[in-house]
Amino acid sequence: MAGHSKWANIKHKKAAADAKRGKVWTRLIKEIQVAARMGGGDIDSNPRLRLAVEKAYDANMPKDNVNRAIQRGVGGVDGASYEEIRYEGYGIGGAAVIVDTMTDNRTRTVAEVRHAFSKNGGNMGTDGSVSFMFDHVGQFLFAPGTPEDKLMEAALEAGAEDVVTNDDGSIEVLCPPNDFPKVKSALEAAGFKAELAEVTMKPQTEVEFTGEDAVKMQKLLDALENLDDVQEVYTNAAIAEE
């Protein structure tokens, strides 16, 4: 099945993440702490923690930092205690936006998120106002030129639900969130290393943005992404590359 062009957007996302590595590490440390607190410090029995640790190593985080975050999560080291809060809202033209945060001060966080929306042409919604427009999935993205038939066979054997070939030749593999670690391991064992592998909120349909509207929408997304308490920002806005 065909899909939208993804490759340029993914490369942009990876480059932006690399440029903000310090912020990426801060977000990953929070994720490790919360995952360890909720599911324990053993990565073999805690899939969420295992995924967070893998992301940390992919971002070149030192092992000592990872271990400290795990210990802080299970209570072995003093530190701030974070809670997860999701906010939903609308951007330019009613585009749907989900903002996942981890915070030790929800009053501060909601004020900052609301300000970012209102200052950049958007507005906060209520719980559930836009999340129904997204699917919670495991997503793998492979570069154009990846052998499609072999990847599809390996993905479906691993338990993937869908394999999507995009207009630019990149290939997406989608799976249930709980199966993400299993599918990731199986694909890697078959010789397929994804350029992007994550559990995400994937929009069911996308709204195309071009020109000035694209600039305004990107400004809103950047403002949200740059907030210290924000972990992830999801949107159904497809912003055209310049």
From Swiss-Prot:
<dbReference type="GO" id="GO:0005829">
    <property type="term" value="C:cytosol"/>
</dbReference>
<keyword id="KW-0238">DNA-binding</keyword>
<dbReference type="InterPro" id="IPR029072">
    <property type="entry name" value="YebC-like"/>
</dbReference>
<dbReference type="Pfam" id="PF01709">
    <property type="entry name" value="Transcrip_reg"/>
</dbReference>
<dbReference type="InterPro" id="IPR048300">
    <property type="entry name" value="TACO1_YebC-like_2nd/3rd_dom"/>
</dbReference>
<keyword id="KW-0963">Cytoplasm</keyword>
<keyword id="KW-0805">Transcription regulation</keyword>
<dbReference type="InterPro" id="IPR017856">
    <property type="entry name" value="Integrase-like_N"/>
</dbReference>
<dbReference type="InterPro" id="IPR002876">
    <property type="entry name" value="Transcrip_reg_TACO1-like"/>
</dbReference>
<dbReference type="GO" id="GO:0006355">
    <property type="term" value="P:regulation of DNA-templated transcription"/>
</dbReference>
<dbReference type="GO" id="GO:0003677">
    <property type="term" value="F:DNA binding"/>
</dbReference>
<comment type="similarity">
    <text>Belongs to the TACO1 family.</text>
</comment>
<keyword id="KW-0804">Transcription</keyword>
<dbReference type="InterPro" id="IPR049083">
    <property type="entry name" value="TACO1_YebC_N"/>
</dbReference>
<protein>
    <recommendedName>
        <fullName>Probable transcriptional regulatory protein Bxeno_A1185</fullName>
    </recommendedName>
</protein>
<dbReference type="InterPro" id="IPR026564">
    <property type="entry name" value="Transcrip_reg_TACO1-like_dom3"/>
</dbReference>
<dbReference type="Pfam" id="PF20772">
    <property type="entry name" value="TACO1_YebC_N"/>
</dbReference>
